[in-house]
Design a protein with these regions (language model features):
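Bacterial N-terminal signal peptides that target proteins for export
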Residues: 1-8
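Serine/proline-rich low-complexity intrinsically disordered segments, especially terminal tails, linkers
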Residues: 8, 352-355, 375, 442
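Cleavable N-terminal signal peptides
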Residues: 9-10, 20
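Mature catalytic domains of secreted/periplasmic carbohydrate-active enzymes
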Residues: 23-357, 396-399, 405, 411, ...
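Short clusters of hydrophobic/aromatic residues that line enzyme substrate/ligand-binding pockets
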Residues: 103, 254, 362, 371-372
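Aromatic, loop-rich ligand-recognition surfaces of beta-strand-rich domains
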Residues: 328-334, 363-465
């Protein structure tokens, strides 16, 4: 009997070891991919779609495919222009928020093959950029006003369409360095990662192209010092999102248009673009030093070509910018959060709260509101009481600023409290990964803090990889 127990214990230990080693290996693989992405330094965003034929970035969702007809489109011109600026890659908008697809897709008739142009723009883009020795990335919007993939309208058919479209993009056009996703769990799009399940999409992308970096432009919502639902932190500079060049410790991407907006407008040929020398010296170079890849948008006109003023600016950028060979310098971040937040909008309890800053502010999916402990409480506590018992392995405590220094985390299982962490952690984002736990409640007891504690978000996940 003892021999059987010993063998069983040995096998269980071995399986656990293999599982942990597998997770470490995947995390290390991602770390190498993140460094390789940051080391690309500088690339070209290309917003080219139905909005090009309107003077608005958000056109009529029912705009006819007949509008799209870039009779002189030359992706080789784009690629050579990118190369002249010392860029290393290009990224094309395959589908923007109005839902028009610029590739030969079987998922919808709202695509380029139904236009007078009848050419696969994605195919010509990847071919031209690779021929010039440049890597290729693709942009894809979850928000889709034409197909009614928008708040309070999402049905299973929409999720199936997203998966079909991503499968086409990741199987028909060779290796894709990175996929930039937009219009998803942002304050303005209001499509959550529950509405269109992020974990399913993430795993689909990685199953089709394991080396493809997946980024979501979710910087308007999620904090800068945690990887939430993205392999790379993203910053839309035109929307006021700013990376701290002094303190950033995350692999990052920042984007900005060369012209006044993302898609081409009729005044672009005669309107000055951003100062190319300033772009290099005040934006590109400082961002690169802060572990941030910079992607500059250049909008083709209605003929499918870059305007002369844009071409001239890119040449000046290339003459000014000399890509350094300094490798990315950030520590491994670990895998990003990709699963559903089990604590969101669940019943919450706490010790005495301060004024109106009560318990539900810490699990309302809003990083700008907080539960605040009353200053009279010496060791305040906060807990999530799940409506039904949950299995989980990851807990995140987010503070608006670092304050809590020492605390204990425990969960209730069969009316017994079990501690899984007790100690110090002074970071603003306190991330805890552990073996699987199962319980009806999870609680943090705060033992030391610099001032009266507050928690902006208390999050619980079951991360399966």
């Amino acid at each position: 009997m003892k021999k059987i127990r010993s063998v069983t214990l040995f096998i269980a230990t071995l399986l656990l070891t293999f599982n942990v080693l597998g997770q470490v290996s995947k995390s290390n693989d991602l770390y190498e991919r993140q460094k390789a992405f940051v080391d690309l330094k500088f690339g070209m965003f290309i917003h080219f779609n139905i909005p090009t034929y309107y003077n608005q970035d958000w056109p009529d969702p029912e705009a006819s495919p007949m509008q799209f007809n870039p009779t002189k489109m030359d992706c080789t011109q784009w690629a050579k222009a990118a190369k002249s600026a010392n860029m290393t890659y290009g990224c094309l908008t395959t589908k923007h928020h109005s839902g028009f697809c610029v590739w030969d897709t079987k998922s919808t008739n709202y695509n380029v093959m139904q236009s007078p142009f009848k050419r696969d723009v994605v195919k010509e883009f990847v071919t031209a950029f690779r021929k010039e020795g440049l890597k290729v990335m693709l942009y894809y919007s979850i928000l889709d006003t034409h197909h009614k993939l928008r708040p309070n309208q999402i049905q299973p058919k929409h999720i199936a369409m997203v998966k079909q479209q991503l499968k086409e993009l990741l199987t028909k056009y060779g290796p894709i360095e990175a996929l930039i996703i937009d219009g998803w769990d942002a304050p303005w799009s209001r499509i959550s990662y529950d509405d269109v399940p992020f974990e399913q999409v993430y795993k689909l992308v990685k199953s089709l192209q394991p080396n493809c970096i997946l980024m979501d432009l979710n910087g308007a919502k999620y904090p800068s010092d945690g990887l939430y639902y993205t392999d790379i932190k993203t910053y839309e500079m035109g929307a006021g999102q700013r990376l701290s060049k002094e303190t950033n410790q995350m692999p990052a991407l920042a984007c900005l248009p060369l012209q006044s907006s993302w898609f081409w407008k009729t005044d672009f040929p005669t309107t000055p673009v951003k100062d190319p020398v300033k772009l290099v010296n005040e934006t590109l170079v400082p961002l690169n030093k802060a572990n941030c890849n910079f992607i500059l948008n250049v909008a083709p006109n209605r003929e499918g070509l870059f305007d002369d003023n844009a071409l001239a600016a890119l040449k000046v950028i290339g003459d000014t910018y000399k890509k350094d060979n300094q490798p990315a310098n950030f520590k491994a971040t670990g895998a990003p959060i990709i699963s559903k937040n089990l604590a969101k909008n669940q019943p919450a309890n706490s010790s005495w709260s301060d004024d109106m800053n009560i318990m539900d502010f810490a699990n309302d999916d809003d990083f700008h509101s907080s539960w605040q402990s009353n200053p009279e409480v010496k060791q305040p506590w906060y807990e999530i009481a799940f409506k039904t018992p949950q299995t989980f392995n990851t807990v995140v405590i987010f503070e608006s600023k670092p304050n809590i220094r020492k605390y204990k985390l425990e969960y209730e299982d069969n009316n017994q409290w079990k501690t899984f962490f007790e100690g110090e952690n002074t970071k603003r984002v306190k991330l805890h990964r552990a073996s699987k736990m199962h319980g009806s409640k999870i609680r943090v007891t705060i033992q030391e803090a610099d001032s009266s504690p507050s928690i902006a978000e208390f999050q619980v996940y079951n991360e399966v990889r």
